[in-house]
């Protein structure tokens, strides 16, 4: 009997697609409309695919198959983000070269993806570890190295939009005369300090016990190495940085035109952290009043300088209206002014504090919950608005990488400053008070009434007297204790004082960003080598000057190494490479040494979407004409975990290439969708009291008493209960809850968790494909619910869609025959009106659902069609063939088999998508629900377009409705044509 047999059908069609290169997009520029659909390509781990991967891949595959059938040129590709830590860690443990491990893992991933029938153009496949690929990763890095950002340059791009700020060739950087006069080396150092790719001393995670630098993800929250649980300390190493901060404004503002989820846009904006405020200089020169006054007079003449000198500490604040409340200053321990500001008697304390701060991560330092620590430098600064001298402290909650690395501390109006002031008994001066309407003021102590004063500038408001603050007041209000600004509303005060500071030459309006430059180097082997030479002096020591590797010498290929053990020092692993790779001498005798850091895993994934459009080009990273045709990516689907870093880094690289004229689009990804997570199957837990009696989960809460040895307790008594793991046959669904089969009053706890090895709930797609077939897996993952939502796995759900595919097969195939042939009910007869209506409604609904990425509802429509047609004694071929085309994007193997059975000799991959006829969808009658007091009690059929009177009359005459109305008083009848009839009744 020719039953539906996925294990026979699917390998057959996968081989057919491979042999006929069905989904290959020919090289060159095609005619017609394009559709570039891209998955976030995976890291090929040793674990292979899990069932979460195919969710996004199936969604993009449906879109691509649908687009091909619409006649569009589709670019749909797959590759491998294959540099990374796991392969190198495996090499350290086993001695197996990372390349061997990576290639083995890629082979497994490719096998799994092909078994799922995705319509990738495999001729464009590449891995970021391919030298032919990372040659161009290195080339793009050199474009960053060759670029400086002209913040004042106004220009119009190929998209017709005018922007301010542009990346320009380093050769166009204006060189000051004094730098030119100092010679070539000085000019080169000046250029190096302005490049988008530059070197800078940055703290890294150094583990002495392991003898290596660790990535942040390899360090636990307790500051220990993930491997071995060894102490990790922070050390400064010279690192490569990318000046992403230069593009902060454009990265933030140009999100607006992208079709991305609002949540992702918000995450990126928050990460960039744009804020409006003011820069203010606090005087640290002569401690005398005369010195301060002389400085202010000079500033009034010369204005606010672009860069601060040694006489000031420059701060950035979003609340210039609180300047009068600054009672101390805080510098980051790494601030360059700390050494000269620290007095002799404070030197030992400051040095020890800086040493301890250097051991902490930025995350630990800025943790709001941690105890505030700090040390006084012994020096003072003068507040420019009131001449008050305030002490200068250092504290680790201030980061040198944010703002200016110095803050004015206003403890009355900032939570961290308040906690610090309380810890060290520093003054707290309130300078902003809340504005309270007189009608809402309640004064219990009538003696306080004499202290209330009216605010003439805000009629109806009063000033509430200052009381000792129990916490920082961080809201807006009006100014107090702020000299001539008293009484001004916060927003007005901000505007006024920014202008006054500018006029006095001690401050100015400013924009700041939380975003920091991108630390771009790693001390690893398995990453792209930097295409950079360091120049050495005659003794072999670095001169501090660097030069780019010539384009003709790219790629700089990773050297063959057998020893992947850490060096035991902060030197990168590549420092152990053979000398013939490490060193060279130029024709004019300059000694060179290669950069021995490697690029991070992010590098290769920053631009892979460009290479897919032209993967075999040996002359350019992408042909200009192909870039113009294929870019931007029309639909990009991937996990929300990449919402910030990967997407931000890709956008940054793309904008630099855009500025340099290498690409014509300002953004890489026009539409972004984050698929939801597929969770493990729900875990069912019941609860028993001390007597073994079942209690409802609704009467139980998690135990918060550490002294009690129990995970859960009774909500009302706090007595412990025992959690019991239940099996599926012990429970049943009742409404929104799961209950015990033996006692339906007992609600059990049902929770789905992220799939993980530790929970033992990981599902391997190979197992599903083997048992049910790839089409069932694809269909189930799309049927689980909306694409963007998290959804729990259910084997019964897989079984359900498998049965649906079996029904679709039987609808067309005669399972009673000895060989596969059409069901006798399938006939070459014209469809009747009802059959045409079912078909065209399904065509319309499925197409619209695919356009909206609402795949679960599209599948529901096809299930409805199958149920309706299966009930027909005669099934016109004219409605079945279009249905097979609708099914094709979702279950392509089955669709191809049925298409062939209908006598077609070529793949349906490029068959035209069925078109619906609006005239065939209209019905002569429509079904309208009838409600009694808002609850549906019956349904009636009325002519299409029936008016209110017809609706009411038909409903009143319906026997079912009459039964519900009997003995009741009809107060009102609401009839909405085409929608509903509602009887409002009494009695």
What is each of the regions a protein language model found here?
Residues 81, 152-159, 193, 198-205, ...:
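Helix-rich, typically C-terminal accessory recognition domains appended to large enzymatic cores
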Residues 3, 16-20, 94-313, 406-549, ...:
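Residue patterns forming the tRNA-binding/recognition surfaces of aminoacyl-tRNA synthetases
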